[in-house]
Amino acid sequence: IMNNIYEDIAKRTQGDIYIGVVGPVRTGKSTFIRRFMETLVLPNIENDFKRERTKDEIPQSGSGRTIMTVEPKFVPADGVEIKIKDTVSLKVRMVDCVGYIVDGALGHEEDGKQRLVSTPWSKEAMTFEKAAEIGTKKVIKDHSTIGIVIITDGSVTGIERSSYIIPEERVIKELKSLKKPFAVVLNTKHPNSEDTKFLRKDLEEKYDVPIIPMDVDKMDEEDIEEVMETVLYDFPLGEIGRASCRERV
């Protein structure tokens, strides 16, 4: 079954799986990219040199409240060919986004003012908040064939769930308006708890999209498959090849 999922996605994206990973800060976006690369991408890169180089480009991820990603990062820089189960060839690249700011997160301010960050989309440095906003739109619209939104119940960072709600609403609304296929991952230390089941149900009703709860730090091949299958179902039926990707910053 796994091959079929990747084969179907490859047909719909001309073989380019460019994944924009977006969401509020401190939800686990860099961790998702690291696990995805370690689990699905690195083992399927045939060229040793490219495998090592790709490994070096995987973003740092950390626990706690401090923001790790302060500028958008393409991982790997030019996309890399992988072959799944020796049958499906794909070109994969992920984009780690600057997230929308969450109350309680640290690292986006200096001397009480918002930090200025540099981005590929502007010669001028811009505030963290603006970088998150422009970056999310740009990454999904121009540099992704599919989107993954990472949200959390707060158990992975110790930041209150309530602090995440407004930025989470913004990012999901943004993705819906951009009309790219996407999936929503709920990052939690307790994916199978009753509380998580209730939260999932609430969020699915609120956003009208499937929510996949998992502990992203422990994400395995089966979890990735579930995410990709959810994305696949979000492609419009019969619109094979529509999700083309403009390669310009």
Can you say where each PLM-predicted feature lies in the sequence?
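Charged helix-capping and loop-helix junction motifs
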Residues: 163-169
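Conserved NTP-handling cores and scaffolds of large molecular machines
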Residues: 40, 44-52, 101-105, 140, ...
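Conserved G1/Walker A P-loop phosphate-binding module
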Residues: 1-123, 141
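Hydrophobic/aromatic beta-strand patches that form the interior of the parallel beta-sheet core
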Residues: 19, 93-95, 145-149, 183-185, ...
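Inter-motif core of Ras-like GTPase G domains
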Residues: 105-158, 174
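Canonical P-loop GTPase G-domain recognition
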Residues: 170-183, 188-246
